[in-house]
Amino acid sequence: LALAAHLALPPGGGKNCPAVVIAHGFPSGPGGGANSPATFPELAERMAAEMGWVVMVPYLRGMPGSEGSFSLQGWRDDLLAAIEYLVGLPEVGAVWTAGFGTGGALAVCAGAADLRVNGVAALATPADFNDWADNPRRLLLHARKAGLVDESAPPKGFDEWKASLSEISAELAVIQLAPRPLLVVHGSDDEVVPPLDARLLSGTHGAGELRMISGAGHHLRHDPRAIAVLLGWLDRQQRELIY
């Protein structure tokens, strides 16, 4: 399975650079809409140029430029593959994951599963996917409309596809992630994912850093305050690792 990705490297390269995999959210329409991964290369290049980070933004399976069809398990596996790729680059030292919305939950799950990940930042992240699990065929229809799944046929192994919706849970994964650091950022006015989910994730982790963005909605990629919190946290993470 071949996936497209944007890889940003610091000017002049170097070795043992901090690195992060950033996971986009579930698209709100064809091409991604407000959750489009096309909005992330600019952020990645900024982080590489201003902070000296290696940044990878994978276009998860089913997204434009990438092969395959959407499944929750598949997207998690794509993030694990991205981590594996980053770790193998000569420029890369320590690795973190970050994500927005669905991507935030899967960044937690992938980070928990790979002990080489130093910490995770989760923004506008659902604690679980029970709403999807309760109505998988509605999700499948949404995925088709967004261009993530072949229009003509259901995903191969629909039962397995459906099962992953209840099996994959950021709330469970943060237990495995601890005591590695967790940042949880959420908009106080998020109407897609209840702010209670953010409190649940940070509380279940036990030492998660929770930052609520006053008046912000769900699409935190487009909120400068949320991005400032993310970049500040990553910078502190890297500095604490050095000292």
Tell me what each language-model feature is.
Residues 1-15:
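N-terminal cap/lid segment of alpha/beta-hydrolase-fold proteins
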Residues 42-65:
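Conserved alpha/beta-hydrolase
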Residues 177-178, 184-186, 190:
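Short beta-strand/loop motif that positions the catalytic acidic residue
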Residues 39, 69-90:
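Alpha/beta-hydrolase active-site loop
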Residues 12-47:
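Short, surface-exposed "cap/lid" segments of acyl-processing enzymes
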Residues 216-227:
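Catalytic histidine-centered segment of alpha/beta-hydrolase-like enzymes
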Residues 110-160:
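Hydrolase active-site cap/lid region
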Residues 191-197, 221-222:
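Conserved alpha/beta-hydrolase "acid-adjacent" motif
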